[in-house]
Amino acid sequence: MTMKIKILILFFTVCCYAKGSTIPIQSDKEHNTVTRIDMSEYKTINFDNLVKNISCTRLESNLFDYGITMTTHKDRLYIMGRTIAGNKVVIFDKSGQLVKELTFADALLVISMAIIPDAEELWVVSRFKIINKFKLDGTPIKRVSLPFPCANLIPVGQQNFLVYSGGTCNSRGSIEGHFLALTDFKSINKLFLPKWGKEEWPSAPQNIYAQDEKANNLFIFPNDIDTIYSYNQQKGAVYPFLFLDFHGDFLTKDKHPYGPGEDQEMSEIITKRKYIYSHYSFNQASGKLFFKLVGKREDFCSINLKNNVLYSFNRLFDNFMPISYNPFIGSDGKNLYVLVQEKELAEHYQNIKCTYPAIQRLLPALSLDGNSWILLTIEIKE
């Protein structure tokens, strides 16, 4: 290859980046590719354009101050909620009737949960090492202590689980020097994402995993990392999938404050919005990834997995914006779930026309000072 041709190829590559195109980048020895998404090149849309339908379920009991995350299984809803005393799990049936409230002695240290379909169990993680096992109706089974840190887990078939360690530079939040491990809880089978950065205290991101069961895909978006990963079930491996290029505006692990001045530096980052310092609401629905940015940018993002087109929107249906910092608390692959208090909806629709029949039918029964929880099931267009 002549020098002129090499220069032309280099020039073309640079131009693609400058224009915000997504181009494949070789990421490993097996020629798997990661696609770059220019996060400054997005199409601003109205969220209503993505919505096919909305249905509403009033939950029977108000047992938490706000919802953290939610999962569904068969005819039940499992919501992890937060109170001043810590976290709990509340189980409802699909009609919103209370099935059971699960409270914990170490509620302040309860961090995540997962449904284990093969075992027909609910697992609740606490203290970054304890698994509290329950039957699906909330009946306690046993409490297990793990030999390695665990912030979030998800079953991936064949009695294997993908475990996120908590994301630290030390043994408090890493597994044999890595952030992700494939394990059957008898041994560590594989390790992914070598530890980096200088964070010393583990964290449990909400909605770190986004499943696309229809396409047999699992996506992972860890905290303080500007890359979305995918889990290949056939190979039993995690690969980088989408590199989100924020042009230096995203607070990655290498930029995260540490040491004696960590609290003060982090406070300044938050108050002055120096970086995008967090993301929430990571979910997949109808072939699209969703997440919300916090800090220097506060918008919602959606990436169409068919063509990698990036969309941005600032509010939800009918220009509504819930109080929660984590609006999309869950997804079943087709629907996004939003949990709001009735007074939020009542206040919003005082002077705004409602365009969704299910919400229209609900409005007359809503009170401006009502604290009942309303679960909104938002069906996303294909």
PLM segments and residue spans:
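A short helix->beta-strand "capping" segment at the edge of beta-propeller domains
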Residues: I37-D65
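Repeated scaffold domains used in trafficking and secretory/extracellular systems
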Residues: D65-T69, L108-A114, F148-V156, E200-Y209, ...
